[in-house]
Structures are given as C-alpha cells and as structure tokens.
Amino acid sequence: MSMFLDTAKISVQAGRGGDGMVAFRREKYVPNGGPWGGDGGKGGSVIFRVDEGLRTLMDFRYNRKFKAKSGEKGMTKGMHGRGAEDLIVFVPQGTTVRDAETGKVITDLVEHGQEVVIAKGGRGGRGNIRFATPRNPAPEIAENGEPGEERQLELELKILADVGLVGFPSVGKSTLLSVVSSAKPKIGAYHFTTIVPNLGMVRTKSGDSFAMADLPGLIEGASQGVGLGTQFLRHIERTRVILHVIDMSASEGRDPYEDYVSINNELETYNLRLMERPQIIVANKMDMPEAQENLKAFKKKLAAQYDEFDDLPMIFPISSLAHQGLDNLLEATAELLAKTDEFLLYDEADLVDEEAYYGFAETEKNFEIIRDDDATWVLSGEKLERLFVMTNMERDESIMKFARQLRGMGVDEALRERGAKDGDLVRIGKFEFEFVD
C-alpha cells in the first residue's frame, strides 16, 4: 500500500478556559477582606505549523482527533489559573485547510514555519474579584471558562513544484524526471506505474534550479474520475509551468496530436485556470522509428489550430533514454519560469474571514427565537449561547447577572413581541426557566 496520502478529514478542539473562582479574603486582623477569587487560565489553541520535512498527510490517517488542554481554574488569594499550552500540529507545505461543514477555505499553508490558529482556545472565566463594586463589595459572581473552538476539517495537500509533467501513461514522464534530477520514481513498461506524485530538484548547466513533479498519467475522462481520475490533478495547481510530455513514436497506436488535445481538454475541464499556465510540449522518444515523421505531422496539425499572429507553444524534441535534447529543454524551462508569476489558488474572497470564522464579527441579530412543539420558547444564537455557558448556574448572583445580560440584549422585549406570557417556559440548550413579565 502506498505511503502517500494527500487528503484527510480530522477534528480539532481547542481547550476550554478555566472557571473563575468565588473566594473571600479571611485573615486575622483583616476585617471585611472582600472578594479574593482569581480568573481562570485561557484554554490552549490548536495551531497548524508548516514543516518542510513532511511530504504527505500520512500522519493523519490514524490520528484524526486533536484536542488542546483546558486552562486551570482560578484560585484564592486572587491568583489566576495557568493558561494551557497551545497544541502544535505539523503539516506539510502546500496543505489547504477547509471547513468540512461549509467547504470554505480557511487557510493555505505554503511557507516553511508558517503558523495559523485553526481553533482558538476559550478565555478564562473571571473570578469574583473582578465584579466588586461600591454597591456590591462582596459579589458571589464568577464566570465559567469559555468553551474552545471545535471544527471538522478537510485537509488537502497540493505539492509545491515549479514544473509539472503531464501526459498519458507510459509516455516517459518518470524516465524524464529520473534523468534530469536525483529523484528515483518507479519506472515500468505498463500503465500507471506512477501512482503517486514524485518530486525532484533540477539544476541546469547555467546554474538555475527548480522543482519538478512527475504526476500519474492522465487518460481521457480523468476529470470525471476515469483511471486515477482527479486524485492527483490537484497537484498541478501549484505549478507555474507545465511540461506536456507526448510519446512521439506512437508506440501504443495513438495519434500524438490527439493525445495532446485530449490531455488539454482534461486539464481545462478539471480547472479552467490550469490552462492559464504556459506549456512546453516535450516530444519524447525521438530515438524511436517514425518519431520524426510523427513530429512533422504533429506540428502541421498544431499550426492549423492557431491564428497566424498567435505564438505557437514551444516544442522540444528529446529522448529521455538516450539523454538527447535535455539541456535545451531545461534551459528553456528555467527561462520561462523566470518570467512567470505564481498563480494564486485562492482569492481573498475565497478565504474565510478570520473575524467571522472565530465569531468576532458583528452581526445584525445576536439571538433567534422559535416556538417549540411543546409551546416552549427556544432561544439560540452564538453570542447568547456563549454567555450562557460562561454563567455559573449554581450561583444566584451569576444567574441574576445573566438575566440582566439577556435584558440588555433585548431578549425580554423580543419575547413579549412574539407573544410570550408570564410563566411561559423559555429554553436555552437544556436549561429551562420561566418568563417573568
């Protein structure tokens, strides 16, 4: 079984903040000592960090749940609980992170050492020392810690390569990579010998270097899942230049030009932006019989598809096995790379807004009200539910504080407008209370 894995589904959960403490100072010679309960510590966040030493998402095959630790509770003497350490999760360069529920891209991790907070730890609850006022110098109020963010994620690895080799199976892509770099891809006289992407570093005679990826062979219908389908097409997306390798010997009975058209159709069907990348046509196996005649016919058919003012794609006749024509191909590839900018995979509009993702963005409605089948009024909403879980329901003063917060948010008035009467049941999560008008 291959040890290469380029997709994974995982869950991450940040740590909960520690609960605040209700405590009072009781010492000899210190009458009316007042509140002395400290704050809870913050929960640990889940952070993704890029490690250029990783080449696959294989580590996520069996380890799919990542949970950061919670913060410590507040203590007496006004001491705060210790904040939890963040959980660092290492991912390979080129990892795209999506929210599994919405499909939106959260981040695209491409730089070594790059860090992104994927799930933010909850803040610690405030201790009663925070709630002392001249009117209430000894409050019995403390907050629970805020729950940490919890997310279901989809990870997708798109390898970082400057140049991608595409073409039908057995056209010589792996052989080409093996002779121009130190990579050792599997090579065989049968289709789909390459079943995972291979990456190699290429250095030209003039001193330029670039990363080249050999991708599993495509066949007609790949964009709809035929053959290996789109399983590895994603890896072409980060390349800046495409080397389109064609078996000019037609050893398998196919027409080289039809191969060229077919592969380009698959690239365009999969992703229109793939065709924006400059292509170099690599006419391989030129040491074979009939290759020269096939190349002449290929050039004639290609020219017929272009306007006389259009620039034809560059064509380089080579033989990977005989090591012929490789230097010119590599020099031209390096020159093309030098004048080709990177292609952004995701516009800013594609990425989840960080404030919205973590729930910091202002919204028009902080809560919603529905009438359940049992006539109970059900309250929901991110802000409202966050206030609820941070309320210590075992303390009367905390409950009264929560009631004031609801009133300040306009919940009472909204319930009246919806027709709520004195004594009606109101539910938040599993907690129920009576509406008092």
From Swiss-Prot:
Record's subcellular location: Cytoplasm
Entry keyword set: Cytoplasm, GTP-binding, Hydrolase, Magnesium, Metal-binding, Nucleotide-binding
Annotated SUPFAM superfamilies: Obg GTP-binding protein C-terminal domain, Obg GTP-binding protein N-terminal domain, P-loop containing nucleoside triphosphate hydrolases
Signal peptide: none
Span of domain Obg: 2-160
Primary location class: cytoplasm
MF (Gene Ontology): GTP binding; GTPase activity; magnesium ion binding
Protein name: GTPase Obg
Gene name as annotated: obg
